[in-house]
Amino acid sequence: MTRIRRGNIARRRRTKIRLFASSFRGAHSRLTRTITQQKIRALVSSHRDRDKQKRNFRRLWITRINAVIREIGVSYSYSRLIHALYKKQVLLNRKILAQIAISNKNCLYMISNEIIKEVDWKESTGII
């Protein structure tokens, strides 16, 4: 069996991997075997953290909305507000509500009061 020379193909593959790991420190950017291991590890972490980021932002939005509601000092909670929005079929998601809460607290106060009043009135009269 003859020997296969893979100089060009292997070099191209290694340089492509090295370009990915050029910003890594120490042997992680110089040794081929550790570069491949670190590349796999980096890609796994980035994939995992993309899902984590979605969770973290949702938690942040909920915290911001809840903080503004408590600061205003109204008699209802975050969960009641979200339930009322759902019942009323208002298309304001948590991200938009959090932006409104930061930029204009009075606007959020007016929105929440209107929605809570209508839902409470319908529940008390037995319409829902």
Curated annotation (Swiss-Prot):
Keywords: Chloroplast, Plastid, Ribonucleoprotein, Ribosomal protein, RNA-binding, rRNA-binding. GO terms for biological process: ribosomal large subunit assembly; translation. It comes from the Eukaryota. The keyword Ribosomal protein applies. CDD domains: Ribosomal_L20 (cd07026). InterPro entries: Ribosomal_bL20, RIBOSOMAL_L20_CS, Ribosomal_protein_bL20_C. GO terms for cellular component: chloroplast; ribonucleoprotein complex; ribosome. One of its GO terms (molecular function) is structural constituent of ribosome. The keyword Chloroplast applies. Its main location: plastid. It is found in: Plastid, Chloroplast. Belongs to the bacterial ribosomal protein bL20 family. NCBIfam families: rplT_bact. HAMAP family: Ribosomal_bL20. Binds directly to 23S ribosomal RNA and is necessary for the in vitro assembly process of the 50S ribosomal subunit. It is not involved in the protein synthesizing functions of that subunit. This is Large ribosomal subunit protein bL20c.
